[in-house]
Amino acid sequence: MLTGAASAFSADTGFARSLQSPVSRQSKPLVSGLTQDTRLYGSTAVEIGGKAKLDGLKISVDCSDSSSMKWNVTVPEEGEFDLFLSCAVSVPGFKLEIRSGSSSVKVELRVTEGIYQQTEGGWYFNFERIRLDGKLHLTRGVNPVSVQVSGPEQSGVVRFRCLEILPVPGSAAIIPSEESVRAHRANTDWFVKAGYGVMFHWTDFTQPRQGEKKPYKDAVDAFDVNAFSSMIEEMGAGYVVLTLNHAHPHCAAPIQSWEAIHPGWTTRRDLLGELADALAARNIRFLLYINSPTLTKLGNIGPTGLYQLTFSEEQFAEIHRDVLSEIGARYGKRLAGYWFDSWYQSLAAYPDVPIDAVYRACKVGNPERITCFNFWIFPVLTPYQDYWAGELNSLHNPFTSRYIQQGAGKGFQAHALLSTLESWVHSKPGPIPAPQFSAEDLIAYVRANVEHQAVTTINIGIYQDGTVEQSSMDMMRQLRRAIRGK
């Protein structure tokens, strides 16, 4: 966790923020008080010892027998604290002890479960967020907090993502009841009824099948909305998710608040509005993908594995509020949802960001607009979303219920995001490769999800002119006939 004035707790990381001048404020600050949740990541530990090893991306720590981590945590008042552990456990027999001074909490870890098919040496592991039995006592001031892992002398590790420390009196306010959480979520019935939809990473990196790539704004002007929408209808997709930005902050619409943050990156043509209208005429819903770090100019990964910051926490929230409010008011019910990327990184960089305020901004113009924040394989650390982002890429285990029972997305509407590409963007010149899975396997997966009221989104490689490769089209036609019966 980063040290900051808005934090009730701080963990000593030695990592400083870089701030630019504030963005214009249209209303009262979104970060107005102290939050009482602190998260300790392996990348910000002051010590990593024994057999513990920070992974190459600095986003989790592999712990086998005799592994340890340590942080220095500052708290304003002495008290008792609840503990939540986000980890993946591959084999039984691991034990964990969290200690500060004479206070300690011990736990025997069970094997974690979820929908990911775990692969040796791969990234797909079933992380869960576990509430630990017992309280940790911390005194006012600086407290050394250590995590010690012991386990069987065999193959297998505990993958540590983070430890959350919450004051007991504040836990009820920070962790709403299941009833109150569900009460503020949008209805996902239409999403479930759709069964499956498609996503396109159509960006300034997207290549044509042949010839020279056009500048992004020229590609926007040349985009054939009717041909694209007819293609989606032929695929049988119930909705489309389109990248508004990705690696670069382009925006295919004249959004003034976006232009204020990223001058020159918006377009005169309102391609988003035209697509929303053309798809709606075919009873197909329209959603937007937004990469939050790109929107808010998060810089390179720093020495702690966290983004180097351009804006303050308050500015990060205000940028989202301003942009989402304008987009929401402009498109109203024509915009059915959002899929926000890179939020496990965003929340690590901005630990006190008021996600509830960002979530509320998502509803401007359409209270039933569905929203998710992508935490990838890691547990979702906010109740303020309507469905699980479900970034899978390849085929994994299908869901067994509408609301996820175990794993990273526990409690949320079940949703899987696949990709016909091994990556997400067709960024190399030439033909798009054939899908990485067969039509038969995709049909079986989508059908199994539909039977349990889970939703599947298929990211399809797309050319700059808005067309797809014939092999992808053939696969989607087969899926349509199998699922839609026509």
Regions found by a protein language model. Give the residues of each.
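Mature catalytic domains of secreted/periplasmic carbohydrate-active enzymes
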Residues: F15-E77, F81-K486
